[in-house]
Amino acid sequence: MVQKVLSRQSDNSQDVSAEQLDVVESGSIDQQNIRAWVVRKVKENDKRTSTNQSFKWEAVKPASCLDAANEKFMYLHGGREKSGISNSLFKLDLDSCTVYSHNRGEDNDSPARVGHSIVCSADTIYLFGGCDSETDSTFEVGDNSLYAYNFKSNQWNLVSTQSPLPSPRTGHSMLLVDSKLWIFGGECQGKYLNDIHLFDTKGVDRRTQSELKQKANANNVEKANMEFDETDWSWETPFLHSSSPPPRSNHSVTLVQGKIFVHGGHNDTGPLSDLWLFDLETLSWTEVRSIGRFPGPREGHQATTIDDTVYIYGGRDNKGLILNELWAFNYSQQRWSLVSNPIPILLSDSSSYKIVSKNNHILLLYLNALDAPKQLLCYEADPKNLYWDKDKFSDIPVLQHISMKPSNASNHTVSLGYLNDRPNHSKKNSVTSTSSSQFNNFLEQNQKAVRSARHRHYASLDEQGLHSLRNLSKTSGMNHSADFSLHEFGQADPFAYEIEKPIASLPLPNGNDTISRSSESSSPINESESNSLLKLQSDFKFSNSDDRVAWLEEQLLYCMQQGYTLKPPNLFQHVDEKLRLEKKEQLSYLEILKVIEQMLESNEQKFKKQIVSLASENAKLAAQRDAAVENANYSRSLIQKKTTDETVGSLIEKVGKLEYEVQGTLEEATSYYQKNTELQQLLKQNESASELLKSRNEKLCVDYDKLRSVFEEDSSKILSLQKENENLQSQILQISEELVDYRSRCEALEYGNYELETKLIEMHDRVEMQTNVIEASASALDVSNTAILSFEDSLRRERDEKSTLQQKCLNLQYEYENVRIELENLQSRALELESALEQSVSDAKYSKAIMQSGLSKLLSSINENKDNLKEFSKSKQKISYLESQLEGLHELLRESQRLCEGRTKELLNSQQKLYDLKHSYSSVMTEKSKLSDQVNDLTEQAKITQRKLSEVQIALADSKMNQQLSGKDSTDVHLPTDFSASSSPLRSYFNEEDSFNNASAAHSSKESDIPSGGVFTKYRNHFGNLMTSEETKAPDNNDLHKRLSDVINSQQKFLSLSPQVSKDYYDVRSKLNDTAGSFSGEEMRAIDDNYYASRIKQLEDDYQKAITYANCSDESFQQLSHSFM
């Protein structure tokens, strides 16, 4: 589908029009360069409606229909047709070169626009501004509505925005950058704009079209088909950190390296050629002054970007001619380049063209209405395959050597006069000067400076141009050879000129001054002048003087194109600068006048020197002219001698060029003479101005004396006023100090009131918290009391059950057959008792812990708040009430302690745990982590004590049985053999008890929060193991007495912690010692029962106390230990 233009063998060669082929075959354009461009035939989509039988682009003017492109498609909208302003929308697939129409016939809701701007994203096209009036041919009345076209719904939507809105405009530019629309410039009712606006397109919600038509205005047919946003959005005008470019419209714009690129355009002064960059991050404008040549003024041109290079194409100059040029601007090098491959198309007023980039290729969409049949062509080229005319010496910044100063936009400037339509060229292989026809485009007679703060002019352009040449010769360090061409200094196309045109006459100077060329040409040139001319040429390092003259003319023209204008040196410029610097010192009028006189004298000397230099320059130019004539005569003689046609043709061409150079030199001489006369006139004006200044000086001296007298009188008044001012200032300082003190006191009082209020509020909150804690502690004490009562009942029941169990054991010898049934009942009852005991222990433990924690918190809170509550009577009443409640709690606590001390008389084995707990009390204050190990030691010791208790109980049971059997056997007190066997009732009872203990031990291991279960279970295990050991013999009373004494002696060291148990112990011990052999069986059993019942009760209470000690905090632990001890 892609084919070269000149390749006629392909079927697509017919896509190129006849006019284009004529251009190619005529030889005016290099065919090798044209082959870099390829043409792609644009096809129309087959699926089109009857309303889209042909494209309505025949009468569309260039740049009147706007385009937008994304990564794959290019969209064209609107424009002016023969029938009026169009609202058609077409889509061009850049890959397949297929055109699709988005028009829907009569239901087409697209806005008709011309002079508008459109951009597109992935799924939306945005349209802003333009003109929709068919009668307005100048497009001065614009629109400020924003439309959005959605690709999915195929509908145009009117985006409603809040005020302030951008002014209506045409010819503006719009870019979409990161979902934000940026609008710049344009024209509104004949006024050119340079403002910039921003609109964020994120989150624009729209209503359905049916809801819109019900609310839209029926008179506005176009807007009745649009959708309005449900949410209003607003335009933003960003705050710029720099001044804006001059106002303009119909400029080109694109995005390069995150900056908005703006070039050219049109305003009141005509087409523009300046280049600006807008930084989106810093919101600042920067004018780019490129190195070397640059495009001329133009408007309506197209721009696109590939990497960091911007390509612009087309546009119109100041005469309205369409420019078939492709320029490239390298952003990193800040340099312009012109392509040497002209695009093989003929641009006209009826042709349209659009330029985009795709896959690093340049695509040019072109339609020429003169073709028959009319076709839409797409030209494609790779920028790498194009030949660009770049400067050979890129290190020579030509324009940087010329200083530029801001213009005051005065209406009186020096004109260069009329120039005829004649090109002016230098010799062969030299810098070509600009054609005189281009001067007529920009330098008309009585031309005035451009009224813009961004435009500049030269101060003494001649002197600066020569100075720049001297700097160039010193800094460039290059040897300009004979083939030094115009490209080294940057020739600006489209001001390229054709060398075939002859010169009719030289330009005439302004005014009535005339110069005779014959007299100027006949001036003699001596040998010294010719030598100085050669020296001048060698200093400037040009091949000849014509090169320098041509370069100077060219640079002058470039500056005029950019808005600069020639002006004479400002006589008072240095004076003004010095006056501004010395204004702060308040010089007298006499000193200022002296400075002015000195500056006038120095300026007069400078003008005289300039006149002398111009005279010598005229002499040098005359010598150059004579040398050129001699060279021409010499060339003619050579032509006559040779007979070869090629030599004759080249010499004729050379002669013609030499004639042009001579005439150019004469033109330069006339211009310099004109400048000389103007400088002389300025010198006369300066002399007259100096005389006026002298007369004014005398008047100023008289005025100065009068002002001095007035000043002396005013000085005395000023001194008195200063004294009064000082007094007032001192009074003001005193008042201000008093005011500061008063404010500080008020602030201190306010701060104190605020602190009192905060303390009162905090105190009130603390009192409420204390009442809540006391109520909670009272309820916890009630619960603990009920738990203690239930625990006492359970212990009482347990005591009764143990007594029944002992009676059953004594009657085992008489009820052998019923023993097993009774043992099972005892086993179930024992399990219930154990669970009830464990539950009561855990409840007591929990209630005691809650009580102790509540009491500790209550004590700490009361101690902290007693001082603060003294100031408030209500708080005192509450505190007294709380103290009364606290006393009641202490009484309850004492009662509970008494109850706990009463329980210490039942279990003897807990004395060993209590001893260990007392021993660990000294170390728990420094190392609480050892408390758990001590509790484990207590449990082991309780196991040992329980084992010993089991042995004592077994011995007691044996003694009882032996005493009962003593009535039957007179001599021996042994148990029967059946009782000692494994099948005896007592042995079977303890075997079953062993299995029961194993089950209960497994159950108690799960109840980790009740450590007493495992201890009692192991006691029973040890008792069962003792019963299942070797055959048990019934001891006598002496043996039983001995064994009981040994057990009591082993527990003597633990009895010191329980006074009541110790007393019982010594009573029993004394009885045993006194009546060792006189006790009967019944008395012995009664003594044993009472003794072991008290020991068991004491052990249970001590163990419960140890658990309470282990679970309480440090502070409550100290309080409990102090109260218990």
UniProtKB/Swiss-Prot annotation:
Keyword Transcription included in the entry's annotation: no
Gene3D superfamilies: Kelch-type beta propeller (2.120.10.80)
Region listing for Disordered, in residue ranges: 507-530
Record flagged with keyword Cell membrane: no
Kelch repeats: 73-123, 124-179, 181-226, 259-308, 310-360
Keywords: Kelch repeat, Phosphoprotein, Repeat
SUPFAM superfamilies: Galactose oxidase, central domain
Annotated protein name in UniProt: Tip elongation aberrant protein 3
Organism of this sequence: Schizosaccharomyces pombe (strain 972 / ATCC 24843) (Fission yeast)
Source taxonomy: Eukaryota, Fungi, Dikarya, Ascomycota, Taphrinomycotina
